[in-house]
Amino acid sequence: MPSKKSGPQPHKRWVFTLNNPSEEEKNKIRELPISLFDYFVCGEEGLEEGRTPHLQGFANFAKKQTFNKVKWYFGARCHIEKAKGTDQQNKEYCSKEGHILIECGAPRNQGKRSDLSTAVSTLLETGSLVTVAEQFPVTYVRNFRGLAELLKVSGKMQQRDWKTAVHVIVGPPGCGKSQWARNFAEPSDTYWKPSRNKWWDGYHGEEVVVLDDFYGWLPWDDLLRLCDRYPLTVETKGGTVPFLARSILITSNQAPQEWYSSTAVPAVEALYRRITTLQFWKTAGEQSTEVPEGRFEAVDPPCALFPYKINY
C-alpha cells in the first residue's frame, strides 16, 4: 500500500518567522506579486540592541498553497505554520512593533462577503479583472460592467510588455499533440482558441494560449501580432480584452512553412523569427537511438525538417 504523504495539507492562511533576515531575503518578500494574496502583512521585529531581528508575517493567499510552495515564496529559512485566529488578529500581531515591511490587501472577515470598496482597491492594485473575479465572485458578477469601465479609465489595465514564447509542435493525427498542450500548464491558466473564428470569448488574460490543429486559419498579420512582444487587445463579442499570454502553443499536422503560401504573405521570416521552439514527432525508426514508441523531439533549425532560422 502506498504511504500517505506527510506534512501540512494545502491551506490559504499561513504565518511565518524569519530570523536575521538579509536584505536579499527582505527584497524577495517585498517583490512578491500582490495578486497572490487576499491579505498579506509582514512586520520587522527585534530591531533594538540585544534582541534577534526577525520578520513576522501572515498571508491569506488567494488560493490554497502547499507547505513547500509557501517556503519557496518566503524563503527556505522561514519557520512556517498554518495560521490561527482572524486576519485582523494576525495583522495586529505582525505589526505590534510598528515596523511594517509590506502590507497589501485588506483583512478578511471570515463568513462575511467582501464589499465593493475592497474589490475596487484590489482592481486598482492589480489591474486585473480576473483577480477580482477570483477573490470577489459575488461582487464581480453584480458590478462587472462598472469594474471594467473603471479599469479602462484608470489607466491600470495590464498590458503585455514581454515577448510571448511560441512553441510549435508538429506531428501526425493521434500522436498526442493536444495532450502535450494540456499538460503544459494548469487548465485554469490555459485558453484554447476556437478555430476559424475571430472572437476570443472566454479569454480572461490566461498566460497560456493554445492554437490547436493549426494550419493557417488566423489572418497572417493577426498571428504575427499574437506572437510578438507589444501591447495587444483581442476582440470578444461586445468588447475587447488585453492579450496577456506568456506562452502560445501551436499544434499542427503541418510544418510552419506549409501554413501560408509564400506568395500570399510579404515575408515568411517574420513568423519564423518569432518561434521560440520547434518540435517534430519522430517514430522509433527515425531516431538515432532505439525507442519503443514515437516521441516529440526538438530540432535546431535550420535543418532538414525546417530549413529556416527561428528565434532571432
Curated annotation (Swiss-Prot):
Gene Ontology terms for molecular function: ATP binding; ATP hydrolysis activity; DNA binding; endonuclease activity; metal ion binding; nucleotidyltransferase activity; RNA binding; RNA helicase activity
Bilayer-spanning residue ranges: none
Cofactor: binding comment: Divalent metal cations, possibly Mg(2+) or Mn(2+).
CRESS-DNA virus Rep endonuclease domain residues: 8-107
Motif (RCR-3): 93-96
The keyword Hydrolase belongs to this UniProt entry's keyword annotation: yes
Cofactors that this protein relies on: Mg(2+); Mn(2+)
GO BP term, pick one: DNA replication
Motif (RCR-1): 15-18
Residue span of motif RCR-2: 54-56
Binding site for a divalent metal cation: E45, H54, E97
E.C. number(s) listed in UniProt: 2.7.7.-, 3.1.21.-, 3.6.1.-
Motif Nuclear localization signal, chain ranges: 4-15
Location of the active site: Y93
Binding-site list for ATP: G171, P172, P173, G174, C175, G176, K177, S178
Impact after mutating Q179R: In strain: Isolate IBRS-2
Keywords noted in UniProt: ATP-binding, Covalent protein-DNA linkage, DNA replication, DNA-binding, Endonuclease, Helicase, Host nucleus, Hydrolase, Metal-binding, Multifunctional enzyme, Nuclease, Nucleotide-binding, Nucleotidyltransferase, Transferase
Localization (cell): Host nucleus
InterPro entries associated with the record: CRESS_DNA_REP (IPR049912), Helicase_SF3_ssDNA/RNA_vir (IPR000605), P-loop_NTPase (IPR027417)
Keyword Transferase: yes
Main location (coarse class): host cell
Record note on quaternary structure: Interacts with the capsid protein; this interaction relocates Rep into the nucleus.
This protein's domain notes: There are 3 rolling circle replication (RCR) motifs. RCR-2 is probably involved in metal coordination. RCR-3 is required for phosphodiester bond cleavage for initiation of RCR.
Family: Belongs to the nanoviruses/circoviruses replication-associated protein family.
Protein name in the entry: Replication-associated protein
UniProt gene name: Rep
